[in-house]
């Protein structure tokens, strides 16, 4: 069976924006992602988030790269903005089925491999430069 580097399977969308007041309604932070489910059940903020955030589109896979051992993965339920402590991932559909992709990202197979490349002790984080080279 062929193996693929993660960058051959997924696109890491790095488009960012500085939030405006109305973005508080469509903001997702890591605190909104629950381990064990791809569904988002809460979102938003009382005030506009501060600092640049990642732009997400409905259907994107949101992955918590900070403290990845918490296994926070979800499917974006709408267009909006996402925490810069995460990654906005999209499947390369010529390689992986778009419906399977979120299941793969939330699998122990993927998450265990990703956690192993986390750097830092207080708040371990996964860097794209390391993740993109993992083979699956």
For each predicted feature, which ranges?
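A short beta-sheet element
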Residues: 52-53, 58-106, 110, 122
């Amino acid at each position: 069976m062929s193996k693929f580097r993660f960058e051959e399977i997924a696109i890491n969308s790095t488009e960012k924006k500085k939030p405006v007041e109305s973005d508080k309604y469509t903001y997702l932070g890591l605190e909104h992602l629950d381990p064990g489910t791809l569904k988002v059940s809460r979102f938003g903020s009382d005030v506009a988030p501060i600092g640049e955030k990642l732009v997400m589109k409905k259907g994107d896979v949101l992955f918590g790269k900070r403290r990845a051992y918490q296994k926070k993965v979800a499917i974006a339920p709408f267009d909006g903005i996402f925490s810069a402590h995460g990654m906005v991932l999209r499947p390369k559909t010529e390689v992986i089925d778009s419906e399977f992709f979120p299941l793969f990202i939330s699998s122990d197979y993927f998450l265990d491999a990703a956690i192993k490349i986390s750097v830092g002790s207080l708040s371990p984080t996964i860097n794209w430069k390391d993740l993109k080279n993992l083979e699956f």
